[in-house]
Amino acid sequence: MFFEVFRPWRLAACLLAWGAAAHAQTPAATPPGAAPASVQALYQQHCAACHGAQRLGGMGPALLPESLARLRKPDAIKVIQDGRAATQMLPFKDTLKAEEISALTDWIYTPVKPAPTWSDADIAASRIETAGWKNWPAKPQWQADPMNLFVVVEGGDHHVTLLDGDSFEPIHRFSSRFALHGGPKFTPDGRYVFFGSRDGWITKYDLWNLKTVAEVRAGINMRNIAVSGDGQWVMAANYLPHTVVLFDAELKPVKTYAATTLDGKQSSRVSAVYDAEPRKSFVVALKDIPELWEISYDPKAPPIYDGLVHDYKMGEGIAKPGFQGVRRTPLDEPLDDFFFDQSYAHALGAARPHADGSPSGQVVNLDARRKIATLPIAGMPHLGSGITFDWNGTRVLASPNLQDGTISVIDMKTWKLVKNIATPGPGFFMRSHENTPYAWTDSMMAPKAKHIMTIIDKRTLEPVAEVKGSPGKTLAHIEFTKDGKYALASLWEDDGALIVYDAATFKEIKRLPMRKPVGKYNLYNKISKSEGTSH
């Protein structure tokens, strides 16, 4: 069961890596006339694979009263019965009896005893460091362009492959922590990559020496991580506990922030954290509190004045240090995810879908610290996978939609809709590159079209081609080479592959068998902040 919109690689491992509990597309039904199983046994059979044996989360979020506080029980029952299309959660109405669903719902709203905790002492005690790593050679110990390196996360068997972006040959393959978040983060020199796992582990890996440097567990159920633009800081966003944790570059804990309102009366899961390099800060979205936080790693950051302060004269407010302090921006509603415009002056985020179908996208000015516009995108825009590019003399945003087969194009000066581009079905990822006139997007949320990749001309905003995989198999997540000449897609299956396409002719060039390559990330495009990929 899933009660959040979450990255689909979580689903990938849920359905295929956990044996009997995730054996097939439809779980085994309770035999007719059989005595009702205990609720704990039902949970272990149908839910534990994704949400953890103790309900503390894994591929899916934690199922605890505090994490379900905003979901009413009748709505939870409906989710279990009907599934949730946005996360590809399977429906259980034909698998479980009504009384079993009701019992499961009641049970996940009861507290876990003893209550799960993860303290600063636990974080510090979890840290592991490889001896002698500071003496390792300061250059790549392999022959390839280190800037055209791809890091490929294989969710099928929890491995990472390092791929030469020129020859498309693997350089190295190593095992990873379970259920990595799909977005590894790189240091600006390209030497180190940081991985975050859903069960809270952060791994620092030396790409030049092909060895793990250090690991630490930031929480029990972690959303994602960010690395500062100068490579000196790492921040983790947790669902459980409700914290944001700051580390130095060696993964030594520096500070833990309780994700609460200013008065401390309400706490929240943390939706996401991203680095805003030009601002020398991390920006944090809270899932249950309508606030956006900015935490500066600039020692010269101006002081913070909480509350209604009209100017900064003595007596108007008590200042807090700006360096590593929390600067709060109040919102109308919480954001599930967000990304930045190219100037990093604005955060573009999406709240949960509104019941009346009205747009839920928001534009937040980080300097004015307030919402300045509503994005005219209905449904469930996946802004975190949107891209920006120039069109007809203006900058536009193009965003896929988790609910509709539509790419919405928004003018970033007026925040008005330019065009809706139809696709075969709802999609998750959209990617492009400065050196190509085309953008690629998937339809992986559409059962009958998940094998189709749509190619859109950025000059005309029209679809010009489709790339198709085998029907019934998911083709998703494009990433370009450093020069933009080739596009790499994932055949998102346990017996899957990494498929290399010519970005100009759309012809397949090469296919490398891989175990569910849920994401691949070009080092140069990431550290150079390419407009065609996520950062």
Where does each model-flagged region fall?
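Flexible coil segments in periplasmic/lumen-exposed cytochrome c-class electron-transfer proteins
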Residues: 25-37, 44-46, 90-156
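Extracytoplasmic electron-transfer domains, predominantly the class I c-type cytochrome c fold
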Residues: 30-33, 49, 54-59, 63-113
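A short beta-strand motif characteristic of beta-propeller blades
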Residues: 169-175, 211-216, 253-264, 322-330, ...
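Asp-box/WD-like beta-propeller blade repeats and closely related beta-sheet repeat scaffolds
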Residues: 218-291, 308-326
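Short loop/turn segments that connect beta-strands within beta-propeller blades
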Residues: 165-167, 206-210, 248-252, 297-299, ...
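Residue-level detector of Asp-centered blade-edge/turn motifs that repeat once per structural unit
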Residues: 144-146, 188-189, 229-230, 277-278, ...
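Loop/turn-rich, solvent-exposed surfaces of beta-rich toroidal or solenoidal domains
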Residues: 426-496
